[in-house]
Regions:
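Short alpha-helical segments that sit at the start of domains
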Residues: 1-16, 21, 65
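Short acidic, hydrophobic short linear motifs in intrinsically disordered regions
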Residues: 24-34
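Short, basic interhelical loop/turn and adjoining N-cap
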Residues: 36-40
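Key DNA-contact positions within bacterial/archaeal DNA-binding proteins
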Residues: 43
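Short, hydrophobic-biased segments on the C-terminal half of alpha helices
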Residues: 46-50
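A short, conserved structural fragment
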Residues: 53-61
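Non-DNA-binding regulatory cores of transcription-related proteins
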Residues: 60-64, 68-134
Length: 134
């Protein structure tokens, strides 16, 4: 886990933008929002995102090709994170549980499968949007 104080200027700009965003952002949306801070090319954003994802500060949401800041900024030790993504408002809720991690790790090992990556994303409608629709 990298400490926040070792992040580069670009990495810190991207992280701060994600931390203050009201929902997930794509790399190109980040680029548009960071142009005023000197960002000119998609590669600047992608490099920063790559490091932030690897160090646990940011999560990539595979199903919507977007990024969110980690909801647990002081605990990047979780290996398995699940997300609930609202298709109506875009709200993302993050959940990690060491017991779930352990059970999934045991299951994968018992099958002899060599997992490289795991992504758990639930798509649907959040409680607030469901209540508003009722």
């Amino acid at each position: 886990m990298a400490a926040r104080d070792v992040l580069t200027k670009n990495q810190l700009c991207v992280l701060e933008k994600l931390e203050t965003a009201s929902g997930p952002l794509s790399a190109y949306t980040l680029l548009d929002q960071l142009r005023e801070r000197g960002f000119r090319a998609p590669l600047q954003v992608y490099r920063a995102l790559d490091t932030l994802v690897k160090s646990g500060f940011v999560h990539r949401l595979e199903s919507i090709n977007s990024f969110v800041a980690c909801a647990e900024p002081h605990d990047h030790s979780h290996s398995m994170t699940a997300f609930a993504i609202c298709d109506s408002c875009g709200q993302v809720t993050e959940m990690s549980d060491h017991d779930v991690d352990h059970r999934l790790d045991e299951w994968v090992r018992s099958t002899g499968f060599a997992a490289k990556k795991a992504v758990i994303e639930f798509r649907g409608v959040c409680a607030k949007c469901r209540a508003e629709a009722a």
